[in-house]
A protein has these predicted regions:
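N-terminal glycine/serine-rich phosphate-binding loop of ATP-dependent small-molecule kinases
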Residues: 1-95, 123, 211-212
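Glycine-rich phosphate-binding/catalytic subdomain of phosphoryl-transfer
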Residues: 60-227
Length: 227
């Protein structure tokens, strides 16, 4: 019988794995720090591969000698606006993740506000046009990282927030994002079940590179048995 729920907390400075029993009691925890990269003033990056390895290592540590079958489900909580780009076929990251704290797209956001787009975007998404959110981070990667641009040209680009990246790695390729994360991209209208083509056009983000939006609960993918 599956006796545990495994929760992954992929935070800004560390990754944690917490194992809960059927009674809700904590059966074990493991934690690993995540390296912060500051390549220039105002820029903050993470290594997606480090996030993945920390997640995998913490999960294995917290499980100990328990069989994988003892875990009924895995839940993920994470730093929501951080953007990861990867090759959807190889599942390899194409660049460092741009973290929610990063301000490199401030000028792009200012230009969009100056053109009068903020009121409509706010009405549609509930968010303001700000570098904090994901859309302009995605556009920056396309404009400035050759591997990302090439992957888009080849039809292999996958964008996502951290939970989307981890689900892809855990499942062997599922490309999904739960609504609470997708809502922080500036690309998901309030009350809608999928990303907006018009918002993607405004922010110059290819909608085909985005994940499928799914509910925040229920089964969204199955783990790769090879893990």
């Amino acid at each position: 019988m599956s006796e545990h729920i495994l929760v992954i907390d992929a935070g800004t400075t560390s990754t944690r794995a917490i194992l809960f029993g059927r009674d809700g009691a904590v059966a074990g925890t493991a934690q690993a720090e995540i390296t912060q990269h500051f390549p220039q003033p105002g820029r903050v990056e993470h290594d997606p591969q480090e996030i993945w390895q920390a997640t995998l290592n913490c999960a294995r540590r917290v499980l100990g000698n328990r069989p994988p079958e003892s875990v009924a489900a895995i839940g993920i909580t994470n730093q929501r606006e951080t953007v990861v780009a990867w090759d959807r076929e190889t599942l390899k990251p194409l660049a460092r993740a741009i973290v929610w704290q990063d301000r490199r797209t401030a000028d792009v956001c200012r230009a969009l506000r100056d053109k009068g787009h903020e009121e409509a975007v706010h009405k549609e998404t509930g968010l303001l046009i700000d570098p904090y959110f994901s859309a302009t981070k995605m556009r920056w990667m396309l404009d400035n990282v050759d591997a990302v641009a090439q992957a888009q040209e080849d039809g292999r680009l996958a964008f996502g927030t951290v939970e989307s990246w981890l689900v892809a790695k855990l499942s062997g390729g599922a490309h999904v994002s739960d609504a609470s994360n997708a809502s922080r991209t500036l690309l998901l209208p309030l009350g809608e079940a999928g990303f907006s083509a018009d918002l993607c056009d405004l922010f110059c983000v290819p909608i085909e590179a985005l994940p499928k939006v799914v509910d925040t609960h229920g089964e969204i993918a199955r783990t790769d048995r090879a893990l």
